[in-house]
Protein backbone atom coordinates (compact mmCIF):
# COMPACT_ATOMS: atom_id res chain seq x y z
CA UNK A 1 0.00 0.00 0.00
CA UNK A 2 1.33 3.39 -0.93
CA UNK A 3 1.96 5.95 1.77
CA UNK A 4 -0.56 8.35 0.19
CA UNK A 5 -3.27 5.66 0.27
CA UNK A 6 -2.44 4.89 3.89
CA UNK A 7 -2.66 8.58 4.81
CA UNK A 8 -5.99 8.89 2.97
CA UNK A 9 -7.36 5.84 4.78
CA UNK A 10 -6.25 7.17 8.16
CA UNK A 11 -7.73 10.60 7.37
CA UNK A 12 -11.09 9.10 6.37
CA UNK A 13 -11.14 6.82 9.43
CA UNK A 14 -10.31 9.77 11.69
CA UNK A 15 -13.05 11.91 10.15
CA UNK A 16 -15.54 9.07 10.57
CA UNK A 17 -14.57 8.62 14.21
CA UNK A 18 -14.89 12.35 14.87
CA UNK A 19 -18.30 12.52 13.23
CA UNK A 20 -19.51 9.55 15.27
CA UNK A 21 -18.23 10.98 18.54
CA UNK A 22 -19.92 14.29 17.82
CA UNK A 23 -23.22 12.65 16.88
CA UNK A 24 -24.40 12.32 20.47
CA UNK A 25 -23.59 15.06 22.93
CA UNK A 26 -24.68 14.75 26.52
CA UNK A 27 -24.51 17.52 29.06
CA UNK A 28 -23.33 16.78 32.59
CA UNK A 29 -26.96 17.16 33.66
CA UNK A 30 -27.96 14.39 31.25
CA UNK A 31 -25.30 12.07 32.63
CA UNK A 32 -26.17 12.71 36.26
CA UNK A 33 -29.90 12.48 35.57
CA UNK A 34 -29.44 9.12 33.87
CA UNK A 35 -27.56 7.74 36.89
CA UNK A 36 -30.06 9.17 39.37
CA UNK A 37 -33.03 7.71 37.49
CA UNK A 38 -31.30 4.32 37.29
CA UNK A 39 -30.58 4.02 41.03
CA UNK A 40 -33.05 6.23 42.91
CA UNK A 41 -36.81 6.38 43.26
CA UNK A 42 -38.41 8.95 40.96
CA UNK A 43 -39.86 10.83 43.95
CA UNK A 44 -36.38 11.97 45.00
CA UNK A 45 -34.77 12.61 41.60
CA UNK A 46 -34.64 16.42 42.04
CA UNK A 47 -33.11 16.19 45.51
CA UNK A 48 -30.48 13.64 44.42
CA UNK A 49 -29.65 15.73 41.34
CA UNK A 50 -29.15 18.72 43.62
CA UNK A 51 -27.00 16.70 46.01
CA UNK A 52 -24.80 15.45 43.16
CA UNK A 53 -24.61 18.99 41.77
CA UNK A 54 -23.45 20.40 45.09
CA UNK A 55 -21.30 17.49 46.29
CA UNK A 56 -19.37 16.71 43.08
CA UNK A 57 -16.77 19.36 43.76
CA UNK A 58 -15.87 20.11 47.32
CA UNK A 59 -12.27 21.21 47.59
CA UNK A 60 -12.34 20.90 51.39
CA UNK A 61 -13.36 17.25 51.35
CA UNK A 62 -11.35 14.07 51.12
CA UNK A 63 -14.48 12.19 50.07
CA UNK A 64 -14.73 10.50 46.69
CA UNK A 65 -16.69 10.80 43.47
CA UNK A 66 -19.85 12.41 42.23
CA UNK A 67 -21.66 11.82 45.51
CA UNK A 68 -18.65 12.83 47.63
CA UNK A 69 -18.75 9.58 49.58
CA UNK A 70 -16.57 8.90 52.59
CA UNK A 71 -13.97 6.17 52.13
CA UNK A 72 -15.25 4.59 55.37
CA UNK A 73 -18.48 3.69 53.54
CA UNK A 74 -16.58 0.80 51.91
CA UNK A 75 -16.20 -0.80 55.34
CA UNK A 76 -19.75 -0.07 56.49
CA UNK A 77 -22.80 0.83 54.44
CA UNK A 78 -21.35 -0.18 51.05
CA UNK A 79 -19.22 -3.16 52.07
CA UNK A 80 -21.27 -5.51 49.86
CA UNK A 81 -20.15 -3.68 46.68
CA UNK A 82 -16.96 -1.90 47.69
CA UNK A 83 -13.62 -3.45 48.65
CA UNK A 84 -11.59 -0.24 48.94
CA UNK A 85 -11.88 3.48 48.42
CA UNK A 86 -10.51 3.02 44.90
CA UNK A 87 -13.78 1.27 44.02
CA UNK A 88 -15.63 4.50 44.77
CA UNK A 89 -13.86 6.14 41.80
CA UNK A 90 -16.11 4.07 39.52
CA UNK A 91 -19.11 6.30 38.88
CA UNK A 92 -21.61 3.42 38.82
CA UNK A 93 -20.28 1.92 42.07
CA UNK A 94 -20.21 5.41 43.55
CA UNK A 95 -23.87 5.85 42.63
CA UNK A 96 -24.79 2.40 43.98
CA UNK A 97 -23.05 3.28 47.23
CA UNK A 98 -24.88 6.63 47.30
CA UNK A 99 -28.14 4.72 47.03
CA UNK A 100 -27.10 2.59 50.02
CA UNK A 101 -26.11 5.72 51.96
CA UNK A 102 -29.51 7.22 51.19
CA UNK A 103 -31.31 4.05 52.33
CA UNK A 104 -29.30 4.09 55.57
CA UNK A 105 -29.24 7.80 56.41
CA UNK A 106 -31.72 9.49 54.09
CA UNK A 107 -30.77 12.92 52.81
CA UNK A 108 -28.82 13.50 56.03
CA UNK A 109 -25.93 11.58 54.47
CA UNK A 110 -24.91 14.75 52.60
CA UNK A 111 -23.80 18.15 53.88
CA UNK A 112 -25.36 19.97 50.93
CA UNK A 113 -28.80 18.78 52.01
CA UNK A 114 -28.13 19.41 55.70
CA UNK A 115 -26.99 22.94 54.85
CA UNK A 116 -30.31 23.65 53.13
CA UNK A 117 -29.05 23.73 49.56
CA UNK A 118 -31.43 21.00 48.36
CA UNK A 119 -34.50 21.29 50.55
CA UNK A 120 -36.50 23.49 48.17
CA UNK A 121 -37.66 22.44 44.73
CA UNK A 122 -34.57 22.25 42.56
CA UNK A 123 -34.77 22.10 38.80
CA UNK A 124 -31.49 23.53 37.52
CA UNK A 125 -30.97 20.74 34.99
CA UNK A 126 -34.60 20.95 33.86
CA UNK A 127 -34.10 24.68 33.30
CA UNK A 128 -30.89 24.05 31.35
CA UNK A 129 -32.63 21.43 29.16
CA UNK A 130 -35.48 23.87 28.45
CA UNK A 131 -32.99 26.59 27.51
CA UNK A 132 -31.17 24.22 25.15
CA UNK A 133 -34.42 23.09 23.52
CA UNK A 134 -35.45 26.69 22.90
CA UNK A 135 -32.05 27.69 21.52
CA UNK A 136 -31.17 30.08 24.34
CA UNK A 137 -28.22 27.99 25.50
CA UNK A 138 -25.97 25.80 23.40
CA UNK A 139 -23.84 23.14 24.97
CA UNK A 140 -23.49 21.00 21.87
CA UNK A 141 -21.14 23.19 19.87
CA UNK A 142 -17.51 23.36 20.86
CA UNK A 143 -17.18 26.80 19.28
CA UNK A 144 -20.16 28.42 20.99
CA UNK A 145 -20.20 30.91 23.80
CA UNK A 146 -22.61 30.56 26.66
CA UNK A 147 -23.74 32.45 29.66
CA UNK A 148 -26.33 31.60 32.26
CA UNK A 149 -27.27 32.54 35.76
CA UNK A 150 -29.52 31.38 38.56
CA UNK A 151 -30.06 32.90 41.94
CA UNK A 152 -33.62 31.91 42.88
CA UNK A 153 -32.46 29.26 45.36
CA UNK A 154 -29.85 31.45 46.98
CA UNK A 155 -26.83 29.57 45.66
CA UNK A 156 -25.58 32.53 43.65
CA UNK A 157 -24.79 30.44 40.57
CA UNK A 158 -23.49 32.22 37.53
CA UNK A 159 -21.11 31.24 34.78
CA UNK A 160 -19.82 32.27 31.43
CA UNK A 161 -17.50 30.61 29.01
CA UNK A 162 -16.47 30.49 25.39
CA UNK A 163 -14.40 28.86 22.74
CA UNK A 164 -12.80 25.50 22.31
CA UNK A 165 -10.10 26.07 24.86
CA UNK A 166 -12.47 25.53 27.75
CA UNK A 167 -11.78 28.98 29.03
CA UNK A 168 -14.33 30.80 31.04
CA UNK A 169 -15.13 31.93 34.50
CA UNK A 170 -17.61 31.23 37.19
CA UNK A 171 -18.57 33.11 40.24
CA UNK A 172 -20.84 32.45 43.13
CA UNK A 173 -20.66 30.06 46.00
CA UNK A 174 -17.50 27.96 45.97
CA UNK A 175 -17.58 24.20 46.02
CA UNK A 176 -20.45 23.91 43.55
CA UNK A 177 -20.53 21.70 40.48
CA UNK A 178 -20.92 23.98 37.46
CA UNK A 179 -22.18 22.07 34.39
CA UNK A 180 -19.93 22.68 31.42
CA UNK A 181 -16.92 23.64 33.52
CA UNK A 182 -13.88 21.39 33.48
CA UNK A 183 -12.59 19.63 36.55
CA UNK A 184 -15.69 17.75 37.62
CA UNK A 185 -14.90 14.50 35.81
CA UNK A 186 -18.11 14.42 33.80
CA UNK A 187 -16.99 15.89 30.49
Swiss-Prot record:
Keyword Disulfide bond included in the entry's annotation: yes
Disulfide bonds: 50-125, 74-82, 78-97
Compositional bias ranges of the Low complexity kind: 136-175
Residue numbers spanned by region Disordered: 133-187
SUPFAM superfamilies (UniProt xref): Lysozyme-like
Signal peptide: 1-23
Keywords (A to Z) from UniProt: Disulfide bond, Signal
Family statement: Belongs to the glycosyl hydrolase 22 family.
Protein known as: Lysozyme C-like protein DDB_G0288143
Amino acid sequence: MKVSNLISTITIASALCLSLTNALVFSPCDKIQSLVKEYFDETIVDEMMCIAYNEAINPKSDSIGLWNLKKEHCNTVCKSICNSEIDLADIKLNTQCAEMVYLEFGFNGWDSYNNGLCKDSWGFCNTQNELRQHGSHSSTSRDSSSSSSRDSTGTGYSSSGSGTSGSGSNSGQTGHFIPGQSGHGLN
